Amino acid sequence: FTSAAALGMIFCVLTGFAWSWLLFLILFVVTKICYSASLTIYDSMLGDITTEDRMDEVSSNGFAWGYLGSCIPFLIALIAYVLGPDMVGLIPALLSRGIGVFVTAAWWLMVTVPLLLGYTQKNYSSGESASVGAAFRKIFGTLRHIALHDKKVLFFLIAFFLYIDGVGTIIDNCINIGTDLGLNTVGQVLVLLATQVVAWVFSLVFARLSQRHSTVRLLTVCIVGYLCVCLYALTLQNLIQFGLMAFGVGMFQGSIQSLSRSYFSKIIPPEHAGEYFGLYDIFCKGASFLGSGVIAAVKFAGGTINIAIGLLALFFLAGLILLRVADRVNQSVWQLEGL
């Protein structure tokens, strides 16, 4: 975790000094890889820091305050962009870009240090090789075990892949809808910022609801909410309607991610959380290519992005069905030794 985060911060800062688009792209990809690698380990920490009955609440609070906190570097970077040559022109492009990436890296460091000082790993497998090859063998062995012996986790991962694919596709293409309706660059960023704030509020709401309702019930609400957002996208004609859609996305954006993480933590063996969450993040980060394929196919056929977003309702419907199936499957006995 520490190595991935440290490298990510370094490469994040270096993107601000890239002198060509190719170098910037390479540095950005490396930064993203390091960020994703650190998140895989970060997600697996949930079982170490709380009890099963509080996982939903803790996970939801984590996403909530993460969304709110991210608004701070977001705003600073936005101000730097506005002051840059593309808008006001008070500061040069290099300084404008440099402020954005430096503040992002500094924020990343600031929120990582308390975790490093306060976290103690409790659940782990002893006596295992720490090599990269051994780690990949472990992950593939875990995948084989899930496919053959753990249908609950298998059905959930497939469900998660489908509905989180829909979530990622909507988030990635929401701005495209706004652009088609006449939203400029600053307006796009402000909509994203407002969505973060809405996600903060409703993640806290779902954190409170998790004390009284089951994880699957709350996940069902989130999935149905996104399904309704997809259908509502079919009617979009102006920026007011787009704002309502963005509000709907924000309502469930943090909660569907936090509750998925906490539910997964509950159904996996704690001592193998690392490799299980490796698979979880593969399903998560690998998602959105199906949705992107739908977007591309619809646009190629002459349709609008509104229709494409509407078709994503099928992803949420299928994900919801498989989630309910997973919830009805009995918990498997974990026997992973020797993988």
Task: Please identify what each model-predicted range represents.
Residues 14-28, 234-245:
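Helix-loop junctions at membrane interfaces in 12-TM secondary transporters
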Residues 107-118, 310-339:
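Multi-pass alpha-helical transporter architecture, strongest
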Residues 121-157:
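Juxtamembrane intracellular "pre-TM" segments in multi-pass secondary transporters
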